[in-house]
């Protein structure tokens, strides 16, 4: 499944105020918009440093995750601007370190990796080279010690009811500016991150439904069925019975994080 995810792409329709001609491109779901800056600067003849959608400055997240969050019509029409410039390399490596720390209780895996392997990891993302990426990620995902926690981030629309607030101490927030667009896209969201063990207290494999129920019990009252909300990952609805560790190994983004987006049911 991981190779199929890396092969999937999002069609983009990129515009700049200086030109009436758009830049059309298919971008891998696991890639980052910032990697397009050199070719876009050359195409439009203008220095560019940010992307926006419906007036909202897009964060430095994987393209597929941004698409899952905002749920735009395709091709996705985004605008170029001169907002704050992200250091995409440092951002990516720091995120890899965070995921490594979450899995093992330390970041020794990535910190002890050779410079050659570290460079190959980053280059594989830039080049969408799954073969090289898989070789390096296999090292990170199979340390000598047992897996401690799953690097899981839950993106929750802020319009969710107050009663769906996660367990105290388990959440952070990340909000985009409000907009007059229809409320269905997740224009404003919270990012929830907490410690999820790969097994339950009864030593059973932890499922996605079990994790959601433990973090957001009111929003996900059942461990087996989506009653009030469901989650999407890489553009697809994920069954609650899916084993979390299997998802981590097959469907994490290139930085090692399993990013799921909550979608409220009618």
Swiss-Prot record:
GO annotations of cellular component type: Atg12-Atg5-Atg16 complex; autophagosome; phagophore; phagophore assembly site membrane
| Modification comment | Conjugated to atg12; which is essential for autophagy.
**Residues in the signal sequence:** none
Q: Where is the composition biased (Low complexity)?
A: 158-179
**Subcellular compartments:** Preautophagosomal structure membrane
Q: Which domain of life is it from?
A: Eukaryota
Q: What is this protein called?
A: Autophagy protein 5
Q: Which organism is it from?
A: Sclerotinia sclerotiorum (strain ATCC 18683 / 1980 / Ss-1)
């Amino acid at each position: 499944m991981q190779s199929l995810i890396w092969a999937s792409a999002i069609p983009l329709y990129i515009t700049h105020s200086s030109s009436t001609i758009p830049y059309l491109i298919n971008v891998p779901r696991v890639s980052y918009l910032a990697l397009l800056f050199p070719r876009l600067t050359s195409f439009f003849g203008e220095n560019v440093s940010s992307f926006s959608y419906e007036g909202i400055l897009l964060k430095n997240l994987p393209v597929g995750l941004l698409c899952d969050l905002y749920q735009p019509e395709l091709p996705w029409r985004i605008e170029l601007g001169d907002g704050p410039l992200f250091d995409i390399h440092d951002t990516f490596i720091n995120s890899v370190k965070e995921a490594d720390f979450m899995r093992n209780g330390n970041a020794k895996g990535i910190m002890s990796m050779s410079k050659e392997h570290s460079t190959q990891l980053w280059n594989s993302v830039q080049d969408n080279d799954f073969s090289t990426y898989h070789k390096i990620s296999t090292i990170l995902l199979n340390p000598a010690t047992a897996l401690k926690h799953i690097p899981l981030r839950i993106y929750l629309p802020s319009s969710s009811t107050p009663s769906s607030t996660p367990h105290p101490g388990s959440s952070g927030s990340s909000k985009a500016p409000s907009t007059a667009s229809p409320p269905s896209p997740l224009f404003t969201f919270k990012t929830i991150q907490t410690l999820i063990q790969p097994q339950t207290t009864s030593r059973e494999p932890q499922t996605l439904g079990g994790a959601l129920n433990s973090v957001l019990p009111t929003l996900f009252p059942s461990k087996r069925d989506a009653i009030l909300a469901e989650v999407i990952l890489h553009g697809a609805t994920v069954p609650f019975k899916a084993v979390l560790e299997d998802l981590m190994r097959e469907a994490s983004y290139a930085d090692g994080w399993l990013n799921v987006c909550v979608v409220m049911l009618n």
